[in-house]
Amino acid sequence: MNLKDHIREVPDFPKPGILFYDISTLLADPDAWQVTMGRMAKVVAPRLPDVLAGIESRGFLVAAPLALKLGLGFVMVRKKGKLPGATVRHEYALEYGTDTVEVQEGAVLPGQRVVILDDLLATGGTLNAASELLGKMGANVVGAACIIELSFLKGRERTKVPIDSLVAYDS
């Protein structure tokens, strides 16, 4: 199955000149979603993770069902102020300013093997921030995976962990 056939292309979203790759149509097709999760399992399982970390918010849609499929724990990497209780934070640079990601304290234990998941790899900034945050907590980030890679943005070259993607777009 060609997963690209199930990913809708939305021109001029979220702003003019941007071509948005929408996984909503992939999620809505049970056969395509099963194939997607099966392929994700094949690339993630060999990294022998103890836990999967999903990046807010569409990364949750990938990581949570995959964690269930693989019998692993699931951890949410969220934007600042979205998690209750004590958190560990990491601030990172954006093109114009900064942003912060956080994880609940104790959600990842020192030495645990973690794979980070998201729906899409663009520049790699958020993925690197999540990796640095989890590393700061003592986790061993052994890889990352996403459904879509925008290879023309060269995020793979900027990421600090091995990454797998199921489909790539060159423009």
UniProtKB/Swiss-Prot annotation:
Catalyzes a salvage reaction resulting in the formation of AMP, that is energically less costly than de novo synthesis. GO terms for biological process: adenine salvage; AMP salvage; purine ribonucleoside salvage. InterPro entries: Ade_phspho_trans, PRibTrfase_dom, PRTase-like, UPRTase/APRTase. Belongs to the purine/pyrimidine phosphoribosyltransferase family. GO terms for cellular component: cytoplasm. It holds the Pfam family Pribosyltran. Its EC number is 2.4.2.7. It is found in: Cytoplasm. Keywords: Cytoplasm, Glycosyltransferase, Purine salvage, Transferase. This is Adenine phosphoribosyltransferase. One of its GO terms (molecular function) is adenine phosphoribosyltransferase activity. It catalyses: AMP + diphosphate = 5-phospho-alpha-D-ribose 1-diphosphate + adenine. Homodimer. It comes from Rhodospirillum rubrum (strain ATCC 11170 / ATH 1.1.1 / DSM 467 / LMG 4362 / NCIMB 8255 / S1). The keyword Glycosyltransferase applies. CDD domains: PRTases_typeI. Pathway: Purine metabolism; AMP biosynthesis via salvage pathway; AMP from adenine: step 1/1.
